[in-house]
C-alpha cells in the first residue's frame, strides 16, 4: 500500500482545487481534487503535505490540520493510505501546476464539479470539522 497526502485549502468561502486535466493516463483525469502526492522516504504526513503543497502550488502552508486517514482498496489500482488535511492559511504566490489547472472554487459550486464519489464522503466530514476519522473506500 502506498502512502499519500491530500490537502484542501479553504479561504474566504472558496477552495483551492486541482482540475486533473493535463495527463491522459491519469486515473484522476478530469476530476477536481485537493493538492497532494506520494510520500518520499522517511517523510511524516506533515513533511509530505507541506512539500507536495509547495511543489504543486508554490504556496507554503501556515495553518492546517490533520483530519483523517482514508484507505483505498481496489482490484484495478494499488492500495493507498491517504492522509487528509484541511488548510486555512498559507503564504507565497500561486503558480501553475504541471498536474493540472489550479482554481479557486466557491463553496457553492464545489458539489457540482466532477469528483470521486468517495471524496464527497470525506469532504463532508472535513467541512463539518468532524474529529479525526478513518474511512475505507473500495473502487
Task: Cite the ranges covered by each PLM segment.
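Unchanged
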Residues: 39-62, 72-126
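Charged phosphate-binding loop/patch that engages nucleotide di/tri-phosphates or the phosphate backbone
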Residues: 125-139
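Conserved N-terminal beta-strand and adjoining loop/helix that marks the start
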Residues: 1-17, 38-39
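Conserved Nudix-box catalytic region and its N-terminal flanking loop in Nudix hydrolases
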Residues: 15-51, 55
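Short, charged/polar surface micro-motifs in flexible loops or helix N-caps
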Residues: 10-14, 23, 40, 89-93, ...
Amino acid at each position: 500500500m502506498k502512502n499519500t497526502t491530500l490537502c484542501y485549502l479553504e479561504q474566504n468561502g472558496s477552495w483551492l482545487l486541482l482540475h486533473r486535466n493535463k495527463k491522459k493516463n491519469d486515473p484522476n483525469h478530469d476530476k477536481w481534487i485537493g493538492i497532494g502526492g506520494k510520500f518520499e522516504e522517511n517523510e511524516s504526513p506533515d513533511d509530505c503535505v507541506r512539500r507536495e503543497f509547495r511543489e504543486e502550488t508554490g504556496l507554503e502552508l501556515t495553518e492546517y490540520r490533520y483530519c483523517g486517514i482514508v484507505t483505498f482498496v481496489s482490484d484495478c489500482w494499488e492500495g493507498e493510505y491517504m492522509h487528509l488535511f484541511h488548510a486555512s492559511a498559507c503564504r507565497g504566490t500561486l503558480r501553475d501546476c504541471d498536474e493540472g489547472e489550479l482554481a479557486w472554487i466557491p463553496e457553492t459550486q464545489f458539489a457540482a464539479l466532477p469528483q470521486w464519489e468517495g471524496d464527497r464522503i470525506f469532504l463532508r466530514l472535513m467541512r463539518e470539522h468532524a474529529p479525526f476519522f478513518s474511512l475505507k473506500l473500495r473502487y
